[in-house]
Curated annotation (Swiss-Prot):
The chain crosses the membrane at residues 228-248. One of its GO terms (molecular function) is protein-membrane adaptor activity. It comes from Bos taurus. The record marks 50 as: Involved in binding the phosphorylated serine of the phospho-FFAT motif. This is Vesicle-associated membrane protein-associated protein A.
Length: 249
């Protein structure tokens, strides 16, 4: 490690790392948690890289090595395996990105690393940080999802109104038809009443020409036909009450 620290002083890391110092993993850690590490090559030469960790059984790294062409960026996915998180236990896991300028002819990557001289190697270290979302974050995440049904309810509230309007239109149409029917009935009754009145007048004229004793029959006929105007008034009152009652309700 002393030689590695010496090389750090001699050769600064050529790659630009994002993030530069910390790899953050956000829980819960009951499933695989992935974070990305971007490696950018700002130089005009090809750069070989290798990603190492102090806890190889806890992480899966893809790709864990390769070559980056000049001006290009490679994204490395670091996958933390599920584990029982203890907030009192601080993570001691670390990663190291080791790099070397690629030789002109590369036939075997393993041979390149084995034959590399210490002063040719460059490396950067990153520490792992575990973050567990607190209760406030959970509430903030839940509030928008709760707000959606409320807004939807507000939007859905006025929807039944067109339905109620259509019902009133239907009811009005029925009332109009009922009105027409009742008007027809009233016209028939009026016509019958007129005929009965004419018949009454005719009988009255006949009575004058007949004996005085026959007036009782004429008066009897008049008493029979006299309730018809009252009947028309009652029917009209019932019709008006029915019509107004339907509209008020």
């Amino acid at each position: 490690m002393a030689s590695a620290s010496g090389t750090m002083a001699k050769h600064e890391q050529i790659l630009v790392l994002d993030p530069p110092t910390d790899l953050k993993f956000k829980g819960p850690f009951t499933d695989v948690v992935t974070t990305n590490l971007k490696l950018r090559n700002p130089s005009d030469r090809k750069v070989c890289f290798k990603v190492k960790t102090t806890a190889p059984r806890r992480y899966c790294v893809r790709p864990n090595s390769g070559i980056i062409d000049p001006g290009l960026t490679v994204t490395v996915s670091v996958m933390l395996q599920p584990f029982d998180y203890d907030p009192n236990e601080k993570s001691k896991h670390k990663f190291m990105v080791q790099t070397i300028f690629a030789p002109p002819n590369i036939s075997d990557m393993e041979a390149v690393w084995k034959e590399a001289k210490p002063d040719e190697l460059m490396d950067s270290k990153l520490r792992c940080v575990f973050e567990m979302p607190n209760e406030n974050d959970k509430l903030n995440d839940m509030e928008p999802s709760k707000a959606v049904p409320l807004n939807a309810a507000k939007q859905d509230g006025p929807v039944p109104k067109p339905h109620s309007v259509s019902l009133s239109d239907t009811e009005t149409r029925k009332l109009v038809e009922e009105c027409k029917r009742l008007q027809g009935e009233m016209m028939k009754l009026s016509e019958e009443n007129r005929l009965l009145r004419d018949e009454g007048l005719r009988l009255r004229k006949v009575a004058h020409s007949e004996k005085p004793g026959s007036t009782s029959a004429v008066s009897f006929r008049e008493n029979v036909t006299s309730p018809l105007p009252s009947l028309l008034v009652v029917i009209a009152a019932i019709f008006i009450g029915f019509f107004l009652g339907k509209f008020i309700l």
